[in-house]
């Protein structure tokens, strides 16, 4: 099985690759700059998401793409448009042209960040993005729906919560995704049979979880193990945010919380 990562040298990709090292015989990395420290079975390709022809070539004979590339925080709309919207289209279109079986799209909780924090939601609610970044993730999920329905591409959208070694604040007692759970989640997203089209919250087994995730967990055969509640004493006295997206909902927010 050949697996390809976009953005594989970033913060999330580096952890995932280390946790899954040696599991797949061929791993291709699309990176912006040369010099990635390669692990077992990995090959580095330098380029970006703007080059559809290059992406199509790199996708040849690939079974699954883990799409982590793009901007990972709020930025101006022109930058989000170029990197996260056009870039994601190029990735899905390259996958279609190259007959890739499955795309795992790194979506985000910021696609639904304007839901109140006192409301538990599932994977069927309408998007309520809290930022241009969140809009780009809602777009990617919808684009994946089109590529699944129209061309049969299997798509797993992972609405990643707060990817950290440990929670940073009271909000993350609800949204935390541990490194261990992230690795097992992506492993199941790659290996689970016949997933069709799925939206799965990338969140650990947190007592204060805001997201009903049973359908996605069942579809992938995934079981998160960690619980942010073990860190709760560190944030005693902190008040949860009004909205699930936290600081991203601020009209003046331009990035920096990721």
Mark where each language-model region is.
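NAD(P)H-binding glycine-rich loop region in Rossmannoid oxidoreductase-like domains
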Residues: 36, 43-83
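Conserved Rossmann-fold NAD(P)-dependent oxidoreductase catalytic core, especially the SDR/UDP-sugar
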Residues: 90-128
């Amino acid at each position: 099985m050949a697996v390809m990562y976009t953005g594989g040298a970033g913060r999330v990709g580096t952890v995932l690759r280390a946790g899954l090292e040696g599991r797949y015989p061929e791993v291709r990395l699309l990176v912006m700059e040369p010099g990635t420290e390669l692990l077992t079975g990995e090959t580095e390709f330098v380029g970006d998401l703007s080059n559809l022809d290059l992406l199509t070539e790199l996708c040849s004979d690939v079974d699954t793409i883990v799409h982590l590339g793009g901007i990972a925080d709020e930025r101006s709309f022109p930058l989000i448009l170029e990197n996260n919207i056009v870039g994601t289209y190029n990735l899905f279109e390259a996958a279609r042209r190259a007959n890739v079986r499955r795309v795992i799209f790194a979506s985000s909780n910021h696609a639904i960040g304007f839901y109140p924090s006192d409301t538990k939601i599932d994977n069927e609610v309408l998007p309520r993005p809290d930022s241009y970044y969140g809009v780009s993730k809602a777009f990617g999920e919808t684009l994946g729906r089109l590529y699944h329905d129209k061309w049969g591409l299997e798509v797993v959208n992972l609405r990643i919560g707060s990817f950290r070694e440990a929670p940073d604040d009271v909000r993350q007692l609800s949204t935390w995704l541990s490194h261990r759970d992230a690795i097992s989640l992506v492993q199941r997203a790659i290996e689970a049979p016949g997933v069709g089209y799925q939206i799965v919250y990338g969140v650990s087994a947190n007592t204060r979880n805001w997201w009903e995730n049973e359908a996605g967990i069942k579809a992938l055969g995934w079981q998160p193990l960690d619980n942010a509640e073990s860190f709760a004493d560190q944030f005693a006295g902190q008040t949860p945010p009004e909205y699930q997206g936290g600081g991203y909902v601020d009209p003046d927010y331009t990035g920096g919380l990721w």
